């Protein structure tokens, strides 16, 4: 079978990595790159940088990656769908739920694969976490808490931290727990003088009863990417910046210290850091997209799933505006 002919729209901070990995994945040939801003990162190689999505479509593509600012996702995606091109757009799916819904309809109606680049699902720590939860290693899951903090990224100008970063945590939480959100409550802050929120606190509950909490901001001088799952038998801590997964087991030995034994809760047990293969998440994601296009079993994030994530994120900001929780 001939390689899938791939086009890449946008070679900024994320698109440049797509350019590298698309050239490495078996079964894909990168035949065209488009970016109206040119090749700032020097990733074009032998390919001339085209001006727009129409020029890309003219190359006769099988698949496309859209890595442009969020406000341009819908226009590019609808043109690609009309041309019969299977497409993966970077997260979030779109700048609004209404826009994302039009994209879902376009790709579904055309019988095409429409996917969203929620790359955290392909992080080795989170994949191992989900596998161990499924295996019952933690027993019943009680709570999932995430922290995603760091300095402001110069690449983001058209959305706030909720859609840019909290979308990661909303998606990975529902995916790890295998349950959608039922309610969310949010608080936001604007501290940097920009038009969009740069700090978010969100809490909520999933349909399966798990309670969740997310701390997200662009105003921390240190970078933190952590997901903590507390359950019946202990706590998992996944560090997605390093790909590490650690399990803190509940203690099984009787306690003798009187002030501790008086507390009717859990005690500290063994701590285990797991060893497992750590493949590059973007490569695994693009392989999943390729497989979906070929009709093979795939864990690619569909546009329908991406739209649900965006709806929850918009629920967080709506809750912050009204002071009321939002239900789904």
Which residues are covered by each model-predicted region?
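C-terminal helix-rich "cap/oligomerization" subdomain common to oxidoreductases
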Residues: 1, 23, 63-65, 288-328
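N-terminal Rossmann-like dinucleotide-binding module
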Residues: 1-44, 173
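Beta-loop-alpha module in the N-terminal Rossmann-like domain of NAD(P)-dependent dehydrogenases
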Residues: 18, 47-106
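Hydrophobic residues in well-ordered beta-strands that form the structural core
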Residues: 89-90, 114-116, 238
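A contiguous active-site-proximal alpha/beta segment in oxidoreductase catalytic domains
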Residues: 94-156
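C-terminal glycine/acidic-rich active-site capping loop/insertion
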Residues: 119, 233-304, 328
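Rossmann-like dinucleotide-binding domain that binds NAD(P)(H)
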Residues: 153-222, 228, 304
């Amino acid at each position: 079978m001939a390689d899938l002919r791939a086009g890449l729209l946008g070679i900024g901070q994320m698109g440049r990595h797509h350019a590298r990995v698309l050239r490495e994945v078996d079964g894909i040939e990168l035949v065209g790159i488009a970016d109206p801003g040119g090749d700032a990162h020097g990733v074009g190689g032998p390919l001339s940088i085209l001006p727009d999505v129409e020029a890309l479509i003219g190359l006769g593509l099988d698949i496309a990656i859209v890595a442009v600012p969020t406000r341009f996702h819908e226009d590019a995606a609808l043109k690609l769908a009309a041309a019969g091109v299977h497409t993966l757009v970077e997260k979030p799916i779109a700048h609004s739920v209404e826009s994302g819904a039009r994209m879902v309809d376009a790709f579904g109606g055309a019988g095409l694969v429409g996917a969203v680049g929620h790359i955290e699902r392909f992080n080795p720590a989170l994949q191992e976490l989900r596998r161990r939860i499924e295996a019952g290693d933690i027993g019943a899951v009680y709570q999932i808490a995430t922290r995603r903090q760091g300095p402001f990224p110069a690449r983001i100008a058209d959305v706030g931290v909720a859609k840019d970063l909290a979308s990661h945590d909303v998606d990975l939480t529902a995916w790890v727990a295998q349950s959608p959100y039922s309610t969310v409550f949010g608080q936001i802050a604007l501290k940097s003088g920009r038009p969009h929120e740069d700090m978010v606190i969100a809490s909520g509950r999933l349909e399966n009863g798990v309670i969740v909490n997310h701390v997200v901001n662009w105003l921390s001088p240190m970078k933190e990417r952590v997901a903590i799952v507390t359950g019946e038998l202990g706590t998992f801590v996944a560090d997605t910046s390093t790909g590490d997964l650690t399990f803190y087991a509940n203690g099984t030995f009787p306690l003798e210290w009187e002030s501790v034994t008086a507390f009717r809760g859990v005690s500290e047990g063994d701590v285990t850091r797991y060893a497992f293969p750590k493949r590059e998440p973007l490569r695994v994601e693009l392989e999943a997209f390729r497989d979906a296009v070929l009709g093979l079993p795939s864990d690619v994030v569909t546009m329908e799933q991406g739209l649900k994530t965006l709806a929850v994120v918009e629920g967080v900001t709506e809750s912050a505006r009204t002071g009321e929780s939002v239900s789904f």
